[in-house]
Amino acid sequence: MEIDYRIYRIKLNHSFGISRSKNDWYDIVIVYLIYDDIVGVGEVAPSTRYNESIEEVVSLLKNGIKLPEGIFDYQKTWEYIYPQLNGIKALEMGINMALWDWRGKKEGKPLYQLLGIKNPNMPITSYTIAIGDLNTIGTKVEEAKPYSVLKVKLGTPKLDKEIIKEVRRFTDKVIRVDANEGWDLDYALEMCKWLAEYNVEFIEQPFPANKLNQTFKLRQYSPLDIYADENSIISDDIAIIRDAFDGINIKLMKCGSIEEAIDMIKVARMYDMKIMLGCMVETSLGITAASHLADLVDCADLDGNLLINNDPFIGVKVVDGKLKLPGGSGLGVELNNKYSELKL
């Protein structure tokens, strides 16, 4: 068994602005797990919000991850590799994704079947409109024409209302708002009431993760549901935040493994919380992996691959606004032949 990797720069259709940052590109790492003439593939999309860096990921991979000897066993291999990954959740997810892909290819089954899902009922995915020049909103809304739900990034108090008004000039589609920790309590109380008049479905992560008491207070007065993102990393977080939020946003790159994502779903259901499946800006590789879990959640925000113009993989599609999984075993993802630099 061996592990290989490639660094790849994904380029965005538009500058991607949120409350705390703005980017035109992101570097990711594609990892390959090779054994018995089968290649499992995974994606690592590190986030500086969680103190992750591409340099640390590459350093670990370059210096070598020790692999178990003998016949491949999924559980033993994962338990052997996991402690070596320095708690970098995105790297954990990339390796875990490659292991699941390898296992599915070996057994001739798609990932969702390995997880016990027989006939997945795929949800609608939202399409993200990031913070940017107000003059570009019309273009972005037009690009989002196939999607019935928009996720609009807010978190800049001087612009927030103008952004929503501008979106509403072009469409009456349902809006989900993501403030990315950009508000304070007084402003959020005002915005929740104001947004309720603009066909907004819910608000995601209004405050910094360390302001849980503010979220608890807001929830008592908000006419809109409140979802956790930065407060909802792993399953252990859910019991802590359940009285402050109505729902959670699960992202594979945050939680570190398919198993942990499923644990989060189970715990959220136990507390009667709503569940959204989200993503970072990723290629179709990572988005397809997440889509195999989409049957288990209430709504999806799996559009990271739609926001880039050099996606090197072919995987999940969107048909009439709904996610549609590819055929094939494992993740079912194929390399686009235009991007031969990612071939082994």
Model-predicted regions and their roles:
Residues 58, 62, 96-101, 165, ...:
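Predominant activation on well-ordered alpha-helical scaffold segments within soluble catalytic domains
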Residues 113-222:
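Metal-dependent enolase-superfamily TIM-barrel catalytic cores that perform enediolate-based chemistry
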Residues 40-42, 123-129, 148-152, 175-179, ...:
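Hydrophobic faces of well-ordered beta-strands that scaffold small-molecule active sites
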Residues 1-12, 28-30, 36, 280-344:
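Flexible C-terminal active-site loop/helix
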Residues 210-303:
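Catalytic alpha/beta core domains of metabolic enzymes, predominantly
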Residues 31, 37, 95, 108, ...:
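Conserved, mostly hydrophobic/aromatic
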Residues 19-24, 329:
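Short Gly/Pro-enriched turn/cap motifs at secondary-structure boundaries
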Residues 7, 33-106:
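Metal- or metallocofactor-binding catalytic centers and their adjacent structured scaffolds
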